[in-house]
Curated annotation (Swiss-Prot):
GO cellular component terms listed in the entry, alphabetical order: nucleus
Tissue-level expression: Expressed in the shoot bases of seedlings, young leaves, axillary buds and young panicles. Expressed in young roots vasculature, culms, internodes and nodes, preferentially in the parenchyma cells surrounding the xylem.
Matching PROSITE patterns: CLP_R
Organism: Oryza sativa subsp. japonica
Induction per the UniProt record: Up-regulated by strigolactone treatment.
Domain remark in the UniProt entry: Contains 3 EAR motifs associated with active repression of several target genes. The D1 domain (195-440) is essential for the strigolactone-dependent D53-D14 interaction.
Biological process annotations from GO: response to strigolactone
Name used for this protein in its record: Protein DWARF 53
Biased composition (Polar residues): 597-609
Region (Repeat 2) residue spans: 103-181
Length: 1131
C-alpha cells in the first residue's frame, strides 16, 4: 500500500526533503498515481537539485562515449521511462489535484533500507531527538547520499542507467569517494595528476581482461605504489578494488621494503603471524596480505566459509595485539566492487576493526601481465630492495609544486643527483662536512624542521587548511622557497662530490644513495616519533631523516666505512632517546677519527660507555651509526678482561624455559657487549644467502641468521632478541624438551651470527659441543638446525666416530676424516654432527683441532674443504665436569634403551595370585599413582632369561654383579701401532688400572678437553627421564586393561618388553606417536581375542614378555620395528 508523502517526509533529513518534494511535484505534473524512484532520480538530475548525483555520474561515465552524448542519453532514457508509467484518469486528476501522489512501495522500501544502513553504521547515522511519544515514526533521518545509494539498488532504476551506459556499482563508488576540491586538483601539473576515476571496469569479472582507459598510461604501476604507500603512511590499511588491483598488489610487493606474509584460508593454520608481528617492531614493518577477497566469501561451501572466518579472526587478533606497538598492516584486493561489498556484509566489523581504506585501481600497466595471475594464485613475492620509483627529471621538478605529487624533496634530490652525477661518491670526511652545510642552509632558509618534514608527506597530511583563502599560507611562495632550497642543496652535493673525487682519491668512499630502494615516505613514523620530530626544530633535521627512512640491508667489506641506514624500529620515547644518545656519541667518535686521517679504523677505539669522551659538537648534522654487537671475548682494554670473562660465563649459562608460546618463555637474551665501529662480515659472503625457511627480519632476502649490516645498538639488540626467541620456539616445537639446552644453543648461534667471529672477520662457522645423554634430542636439534639455517633436512651430515661402528662396507678403507671431507665437499653449507667425539681416534681429534683454527678440513690425500658457512656439532655422552656418564637413580638407562631391538611379544596367562612388591633383584617399580587400578609392573633388572619364553614364576636372579652394570663403557681412543715393539716389562694381566693405559688415556682426555674448550658454546643435556615415560606407559596399559578386561585383571610386564616399548616411544617423532596407536590397535585387539579364548581371564594375571626372535620390518604399518604388528597369545 502506498505511503503518504507526509509520513515519508518525516523519515528524511532536511537535505533530502527538497528532493522528495521535487519528485512529488514531477509526479503530480505528469498526472501519475504514485511517486516512484524514477521521479526522485529524475528530479536529482535537474539543475536546481544538489550536484551529488550529477558529479558522481561525471566521474562514473564510460570512456567509450562523449560526456555530453552520454548524459543526454541518460536524460532521454529517464524521460521515456517516466512516459511509460500509467497515468490517472482526468476525473480522478481533477478531484484530487490538491492531493500529493503517495510514495510508492519501492521508494519507501529504499528509504527503509537507508535507515537500516545508517543504523548499522555508527559513524554516519544521525538521530533527531524528538518527543519520546509512541507516534514518532522513526528516530533515524535518512541522508540524501544514503537515499541515492539505496535507490540505485532498485532494478528499475538500474535498468534505466544501464540503457544509458552507466553501471550502478560505479555510481555508488563515485558517491562514496567524492572527488577532491577543484582548486587543489587544478593546481596539479599535467604529468602528476592522477588518472580520472572511470570505474566502469569495476563490475568486470575477476578473470576478465577488460581494457582500461589508463591501460597504456606510463608509470601506472608507480602511481599505484605511491597511493598504497600514502595510505600506509596514514596508519590505515589499503583495500584495492578494480581490474588492476591484483597487478598493483603484485607491484607493491615487489618494490616494498616491508616483509609481506600471504595468508589465505588454506595456510592460516600453518602461519606464524604472531611471531612475525612480534618481530615487526624491530624491522621495517610487516604487511599481512589476505589476497583476493573472493577466497574469504565463498558461495555455498560451509568449510571454506569457516576457514575464511578463521582468517579474519586471526588477522583481527594480530592487529589488535601488535598494531599499536609495531609496524603491522593488512592489505587485500578484489577485482569487483560486488565482492568487496559481499566481504563487508559477511564481516561488518572488519571495516572499523581493520581501519580499511578503499583504493580504486583502474590503471593496469602493460608490463604487469603476469602480475595478477601470480597474485591470484596467492604468490606474493617477498620484500626486495628494488629501485622501482625512478622518474625523469622533468616530471620530478614538476612535483615540487605544493600539494602536487607524493614524492618528497629528499627523494627527488637524490634522483636528480644520480642522473646528473652518476659517480656521486664521497669519503666519510667530505660527506660529514657536506651534511653540516646542508643543515646550515636549511636552518638559514627559514623553513622549520616541521615544514621540511611535511614536504615529504602527501598534501592532505600537511598541517593547516590548504583551501582557506585567509589562512596565511602562500602556496606559490612555499613552492619557490622549496625549489631554491633544493637547488642550493644540489649545488652543494655536486661541489663536494667533485672536491672529494679530485683530492681524496685514495680514501674509502661511501655512496648512501643507491641504498635507498624506496622513497622515504614509506618509512612510516609512529605518532610519538612525529610529535617528537616536529618539536625539535631545525637542528634535528638530520636525525629526523635517519629515523623515518627504511633500513637498507647490505654487507660490505670490513675495511669499508659505509654507514648503514638506521632502522625505524624505535617505538617509544625511551628507546628513541637511547638511539639518539648513542648516535650523538658515535658522531663525536667519527669526528675524532676523521681528524686523525682515518687511520684508526682498524685500531682500538675508546669505550663507548664513557659519557665524558663522547659529546656531540652539533646535532644539526645528520648522524648515523654502525655500532654492532661485539664478541664477549673481545675487550677494549685489559682492565675489562675480568668483566668480559664474567659475561661469557653468564652468556653460556642456561635459562629455564616454560614450554608454551615464545612470548611466554622466560628467556634471557645473550649478554652481548656493544663496541663501536666493529668490523662487518666480509664482502666475499655477499650473495651467499642460505635458503632458510625463516624469513629475514629485514628486507633484502638474507637469512634470519645470515649476514646483515648492523643499524644501531638498540635495533641490533632487538633484532638479536627476536631471532633468539624465534629460534628457541622453532627448536622447541621440534624437540619438545631440553629447554635449558635449547636456550644455550640459540644464545650461542645468535651471538656468533650477530658479532664478528673471534677467529677472524672471514669466519662464519659455528662450533658447538653437546654434553650428556638424550641422543635423540641431540639428533632432532641437528636436523632442525639444518632445516632452519640451511633450508633443508638433507643438509645434515651425521657421523658416529665410535671405533666399534666402522665395520660398514661404505667406510671400508677410509678414515674418519676422509668421510668428513667427502661429505662436506658434497654439502658446502650444512650442519656437521659428529657423535661420540670422545671415542674418536687421535687423527680425527687432531684434524678437528686444526679445523677449528683454520676453518677447513684436510683428508689424508691432501684434499681441502672449507667449512665457512657450516655449523659443526661435537657430541659426547659424558656431562661436562662429570667423570661418570651414568644416570644415577634411574631404573632404565639410555645405554640399555639404545641397545634394545625389536622382538616379538607374548602374553602369558597365569591363575590369579598376588603380585609381590619385590623380586629377588630388589629392582621393582611400583607407582602409587597407578595402584588404584591394581596394575603393577614387576621390572626385574638384568635377568638373563628375560627374553626367553620359559620364564619361571620366581624370576631368576641376576647373573651379573650390579657393579658391572654400572661400569662406564669406555673404549680406548688410542689405536694399536703394529710398528712399535711389544713392551716386555708390561705385565700380562694388565687391566684398566695399568700405568701405561692411564698415561695414554690421560693424554687423550687432555686432547679432547683442549678441543672442547675451543668451541663457541658448550651445552649440557639433561638425562631423559625414562622412569616418567614408563609411568605414562603403565597408565596407558592400565586404561586399556580396565576397558577390555575389567578392574580385577592384573598385568605384569617383563623388563625386556618394557625397554622395547620405551625405546619405541623415545625414538618416535613428536608428531607421530606409535605407542598409543599400537596399544589401541594391537594390544587391545589381543586382549579381545584373549577374552574370547579364556572365560575367566578377568580374574587372572597376565604377563607381557619378550621372545628371542625379532620382528620383521613391515613397510607402511606406522608402528616401526620395535613394536610387533601382533602379540602372541599363550592360552
Amino acid at each position: 500500500m502506498p505511503t503518504p508523502v507526509a509520513a515519508a517526509r518525516q523519515c528524511l533529513s532536511p537535505a533530502a526533503v527538497p528532493a522528495l518534494d521535487a519528485a512529488v511535484a514531477s509526479s503530480r505534473r505528469r498526472a501519475h498515481a504514485q511517486t516512484t524512484s524514477l521521479h526522485l532520480i529524475s528530479s536529482l538530475l535537474a539543475p536546481p537539485a544538489p550536484p551529488l548525483l550529477r558529479d558522481a555520474l561525471a566521474r562514473a561515465r564510460s570512456a567509450a562515449y562523449s560526456p555530453r552524448v552520454q548524459l543526454k542519453a541518460l536524460d532521454l532514457c529517464f524521460a521515456v521511462s517516466l512516459d511509460r508509467l500509467p497515468s490517472v484518469s482526468a476525473s480522478s486528476s481533477s478531484s484530487g489535484a490538491a492531493d500529493e501522489p503517495p510514495v510508492s512501495n519501492s521508494l519507501m522500501a529504499a528509504i527503509k533500507r537507508s535507515q537500516a544502513n545508517q543504523r548499522r553504521n555508527p559513524d554516519t547515522f544521525h538521530f533527531y531527538h524528538q518527543a519520546a511519544t509512541a507516534q514518532t515514526p522513526a528516530a533515524v533521518k535518512v541522508e540524501l547520499s544514503h537515499l541515492v545509494l539505496a535507490i540505485l539498488d532498485d532494478p528499475v532504476v538500474s535498468r534505466v542507467f544501464a540503457e544509458a551506459g552507466f553501471r550502478s556499482g560505479d555510481i555508488k563508488l563515485a558517491i562514496l569517494r567524492p572527488a577532491p576540491p577543484m582548486p587543489l586538483l587544478g593546481r596539479l601539473p599535467t604529468r602528476t595528476r592522477p588518472p580520472p576515476l572511470f570505474l566502469c571496469s569495476f563490475a568486470a569479472a575477476d578473470d576478465a581482461d577488460v581494457p582500461s582507459p589508463a591501460g597504456n598510461l606510463a608509470g601506472a604501476g608507480e602511481e599505484n605504489c605511491r597511493r598504497i604507500a600514502e595510505i600506509l603512511s596514514r596508519g590505515r590499511n589499503p583495500m584495492l578494488v578494480g581490474v588492476g588491483a591484483a597487478s598493483a598488489a603484485d607491484d607493491f610487493a615487489a618494490a616494498s621494503p616491508y616483509r609481506i606474509i600471504h595468508v589465505d584460508p588454506n595456510t592460516i593454520d600453518r602461519s606464524d603471524l604472531g611471531v612475525a608481528a612480534a618481530m615487526a617492531s624491530a624491522t621495517s614493518g610487516l604487511i599481512i596480505s589476505i589476497g583476493d577477497l573472493k577466497q574469504l566469501v565463498p558461495d555455498e561451501d560451509a568449510e571454506a566459509q569457516e576457514k575464511g572466518r578463521r582468517v579474519v579472526a586471526e588477522v583481527t587478533r594480530v592487529l589488535e595485539t601488535h598494531s599499536k606497538v609495531g609496524r603491522v598492516w593488512v592489505m587485500g584486493w578484489s577485482a569487483t566492487y560486488e565482492t568487496y561489498l559481499a566481504f563487508l556484509s559477511k564481516f561488518p566489523l572488519v571495516d572499523k576493526d581493520w581501519d580499511l581504506q578503499l583504493l580504486p585501481i583502474t590503471a593496469v600497466h602493460a608490463a604487469a601481465t603476469a602480475g595478477p595471475a601470480a597474485a591470484a594464485a596467492g604468490l606474493m613475492p617477498p620484500a626486495t630492495t628494488v629501485a622501482a620509483f625512478s622518474k625523469p627529471a622533468a616530471s620530478l621538478m614538476d612535483s615540487f609544486v605544493p600539494f602536487g605529487g607524493f614524492l618528497c624533496d629528499n627523494y627527488e634530490e637524490n634522483s636528480l643527483t644520480a642522473n646528473s652525477c652518476p659517480q656521486a661518491l664521497r669519503c666519510q670526511q667530505c660527506n660529514d662536512k657536506y651534511e653540516q652545510e646542508v643543515a646550515t642552509i636549511i636552518s638559514a632558509s627559514g623553513i622549520t624542521a616541521e615544514d621540511h618534514h611535511q614536504g615529504g608527506l602527501p598534501s592532505l597530511l600537511q598541517n593547516g587548511s590548504m583551501m582557506g583563502p585567509n589562512n596565511g599560507f602562500d602556496p606559490v611562495k612555499a613552492r619557490d622557497d622549496r625549489m631554491v632550497l633544493n637547488s642550493k642543496i644540489l649545488n652543494l652535493r655536486k661541489k663536494w662530490n667533485e672536491y672529494c673525487l679530485r683530492l681524496h682519491q685514495d680514501h674509502q668512499r661511501i655512496n648512501r644513495d643507491p641504498y635507498k630502494p624506496f622513497p622515504r615516505y614509506i618509512g612510516v613514523p609512529t605518532d610519538k616519533e612525529r610529535s617528537a620530530n616536529s618539536s625539535k626544530g631545525s637542528e634535528s633535521v638530520g636525525v629526523q631523516k635517519d629515523v623515518i627512512k627504511p633500513c637498507a640491508v647490505s654487507a660490505v667489506h670490513s675495511s669499508s666505512t659505509a654507514r648503514p641506514i638506521s632502522s625505524p624500529s624505535v617505538t617509544n620515547k625511551r628507546n628513541e632517546d637511547l638511539v639518539l644518545n648513542l648516535q650523538a656519541r658515535h658522531s663525536k667518535s667519527d669526528e675524532n677519527l676523521q681528524e686523525r686521517g682515518m687511520q684508526s679504523q682498524h685500531g682500538t677505539l675508546s669505550n663507548v660507555d664513557n659519557p665524558d669522551d663522547h659529546v656531540s659538537p652539533s646535532s644539526a648534522a645528520p648522524v648515523e651509526t654502525d655500532l654492532v654487537l661485539g664478541t664477549p671475548r673481545e675487550c677494549s682494554s685489559k682492565g675489562s678482561s675480568s668483566t668480559c670473562s664474567k659475561r661469557v660465563e653468564d652468556s653460556e649459562r642456561s635459562v629455564h624455559l616454560v614450554p608454551k608460546k615464545v612470548d611466554d618463555l622466560n628467556l634471557k637474551h645473550p649478554q652481548l657487549s656493544v663496541q663501536p665501529n666493529s668490523c662487518s662480515w666480509s664482502s666475499i659472503n655477499v650473495g651467499k644467502t642460505s635458503h632458510s625457511t625463516l624469513h629475514s627480519v629485514a628486507s633484502g632476502g638474507f637469512s634470519a641468521f645470515g649476514q646483515w649490516q648492523k643499524r644501531s645498538p638498540l635495533a641490533a639488540q632487538n633484532s638479536d632478541l627476536s631471532n633468539y626467541k624465534l629460534l628457541v620456539e622453532r627448536l622447541f616445537k621440534v624437540v619438545g624438551r631440553q629447554e635449558e639446552a635449547l636456550s644455550a644453543i640459540c644464545e650461542s648461534i645468535v651471538r656468533c651470527r650477530s658479532t664478528e667471529s673471534r677467529r677472524g672477520p672471514n669466519r662464519n662457522d659455528i662450533w658447538l659441543c653437546f654434553h650428556g645423554s638424550d641422543s635423540m634430542a641431540k639428533k632432532r636439534i641437528a636436523v632442525a638446525l639444518a632445516e632452519l639455517m640451511h633450508g633443508s633436512k638433507d643438509n645434515l651430515i651425521y657421523l658416529d666416530l665410535n671405533l666399534q661402528d666402522w665395520d660398514d662396507s661404505s667406510f671400508r678403507g677410509k678414515t674418519g676424516i676422509d668421510c668428513i671431507v667427502e661429505q662436506l665437499s658434497k654439502k658446502r653449507q650444512s650442519v656437521l654432527f659428529l657423535d661420540n667425539i670422545d671415542r674418536a681416534d687421535c687423527l680425527v681429534q687432531d684434524s678437528l683441532s686444526d679445523a677449528i683454527k683454520s676453518g677447513r678440513f684436510q683428508d689424508m690425500r691432501g684434499k681441502v674443504v672449507d667449512i665457512n658457512d657450516s655449523i659443526v656439532v661435537l657430541s659426547r655422552s659424558m656431562i661436562q665436569g662429570s667423570k661418570n656418564g651414568l644416570e644415577e637413580g634411574l631404573s632404565f638407562s639410555e645405554e640399555k634403551i639404545l641397545a634394545t631391538r625389536g622382538h616379538r611379544l607374548k602374553i602369558l596367562v597365569e591363575p590369579g595370585r598376588a603380585i609381590t612388591s619385590g623380586c629377588p633383584s630388589g629392582k621393582v617399580v611400583v607407582s602409587p599413582r597407578h595402584f588404584l587400578t591394581k596394575i603393577q609392573a614387576s621390572l626385574c633388572s638384568g635377568s638373563i632369561s628375560k627374553r626367553k619364553l620359559s620364564i619361571s614364576d620366581d624370576q631368576e636372579k641376576l647373573q651379573e654383579s650390579p657393579s658391572s652394570s654400572k661400569r662406564l663403557h669406555r673404549t680406548s681412543s688410542v689405536p694399536f701401532d703394529l710398528n712399535l715393539p711389544v713392551d716386555e716389562d708390561e705385565p700380562l694381566d694388565a687391566d684398566d688400572d695399568s700405568s701405561s693405559h692411564e698415561n695414554s688415556y690421560g693424554n687423550t682426555e687432555k686432547s679432547i678437553d683442549a678441543l672442547l674448550h675451543s668451541v663457541d658454546g658448550s651445552i649440557n643435556f639433561k638425562p631423559f627421564d625414562f622412569d616418567k615415560l614408563a609411568d605414562d606407559m603403565l597408565q596407558e596399559f592400565s586404561n586399556i586393561l580396565r576397558k577390555n578386561l575389567g578392574s580385577e585383571c592384573m598385568l605384569e610386564i617383563d623388563v625386556g618388553a618394557m625397554e622395547q616399548i620405551l625405546a619405541a616411544a623415545w625414538k618416535s617423532e613428536e608428531d607421530r606417536k606409535p605407542v598409543p596407536t599400537w596399544l589401541e590397535q594391537v594390544f587391545a585387539r589381543s586382549l579381545d581375542e584373549l577374552k574370547l579364548k579364556r572365560k575367566h581371564v578377568s580374574s587372572s594375571t597376565l604377563r607381557l614378555v619378550a621372545c628371542e626372535d625379532t620382528v620383521p620390518a613391515v613397510k607402511g604399518d606406522g608402528l616401526g620395528v620395535l613394536l610387533p604388528p601382533r602379540i602372541i597369545l599363550d592360552c
